[in-house]
Amino acid sequence: MSIVALIRDARADEAFALEALQRRASDVWEEYRAQLAAHPDAITPPHQAIAEGRVRVAVDAAGRRLGFSTVLPVHDRRCELDDLFVEPEWMRRGVGRVLVHDLATRAHTAGASYVDVIANPNALGFYTRLGFHVTDETSTRFGAAPRMTLALPRSATRPEPR
């Protein structure tokens, strides 16, 4: 049974709360703490993405935010997962998986055949378990990162973990 009771669109009044969630989730990776502290502009409130309906929030039965995802618009049958962050105490409990399933369903409905992500190297196993595969490596402001792709089945609405 999932701890996620609902996935909903983010509201404008929670942009700063989502920014704080992203900071807490990012701080679990010790190797990025100093870089994020030196570049606080790397994490900003997702005002524009919220206004465009591209941010989804997973909440529990009490309405607490457990995590969120941000996607870029579908272009050329591809959708890019731009952000996926889960509260540290809820990591490894299915929240990220449920958010990816939600975005895959929505991307498929919007006409996408693929979901792309530039993955944190620490999350490579997570994405691989959901069916993503490495297609390339790219540079980010914090170093090299794998570019990964998930092919969306034509008839299925969401990926299943392997």
Q: Positions of the model-derived regions?
A:
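Acetyl-CoA-dependent GNAT
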Residues: 9-83, 87-88, 100-102, 106, ...
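Residues forming the Rossmann-fold NAD(P)(H) cofactor-binding site
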Residues: 93, 97, 101
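Conserved catalytic-core motifs of GNAT/GCN5-like acyltransferases
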Residues: 116-118, 133-150
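Conserved N-terminal entry element of GNAT/NAT acetyltransferase domains
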Residues: 1-13, 152-162
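Glycine-rich ATP-lid loops
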Residues: 88, 92, 112
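Conserved GNAT acetyl-CoA-binding A-motif
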Residues: 107-120
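Conserved active-site tyrosine of GNAT-family acetyltransferases
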Residues: 127, 132
